[in-house]
């Protein structure tokens, strides 16, 4: 079973990511548990329980603790968790390499669903 966290301060994007991920997992007959968080602070509040996640979809532009800082904190716990940045801002892409992000997906693209499927493969 895959454990997935989705962290985005915009509910619409959290729901969209979840919808596409669930569709992909259903097509591949993969069981999963998906948790959603509205801030990096909320996600990091899990402490070492973060280690239970296989994949974390993470927005970059969030209040209090942005996605880049959240990813750095996640990396303090584990280098094995796949981090996928999902953002509307292309200018942060280089920052993703500093935390060994798996992918960098742009929210406002026409083929966002395809990007999620490619990422999950």
Residue spans for each PLM region:
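Acidic, metal-coordinating helix/loop segments flanking the phosphotransfer/catalytic sites
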Residues: 18, 36-55
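Two-component/phosphorelay signaling modules centered on CheY-like receiver
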Residues: 11-35
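A generic secondary-structure signal
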Residues: 20-24, 46, 73
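CheY-like receiver
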Residues: 53-121
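Non-catalytic signal-transmission and effector/linker regions of two-component phosphorelay proteins
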Residues: 1-3
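Conserved acidic carboxylate
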Residues: 8
């Amino acid at each position: 079973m895959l454990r997935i966290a989705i962290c985005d301060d915009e509910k619409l994007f959290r729901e969209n990511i979840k919808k596409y991920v669930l569709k992909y997992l259903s097509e591949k007959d993969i069981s999963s548990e998906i948790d959603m968080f509205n801030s990096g602070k909320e996600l990091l509040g899990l402490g070492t329980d973060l280690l239970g996640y296989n994949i974390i979809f993470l927005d970059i532009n969030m209040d209090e603790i942005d996605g880049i800082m959240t990813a750095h904190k996640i990396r303090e716990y584990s280098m094995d968790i796949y981090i996928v940045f999902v953002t509307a801002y292309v200018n942060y892409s280089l920052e993703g390499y500093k935390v060994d992000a798996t992918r960098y997906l742009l929210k406002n693209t026409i083929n966002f669903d395809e990007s999620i499927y490619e990422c999950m493969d």
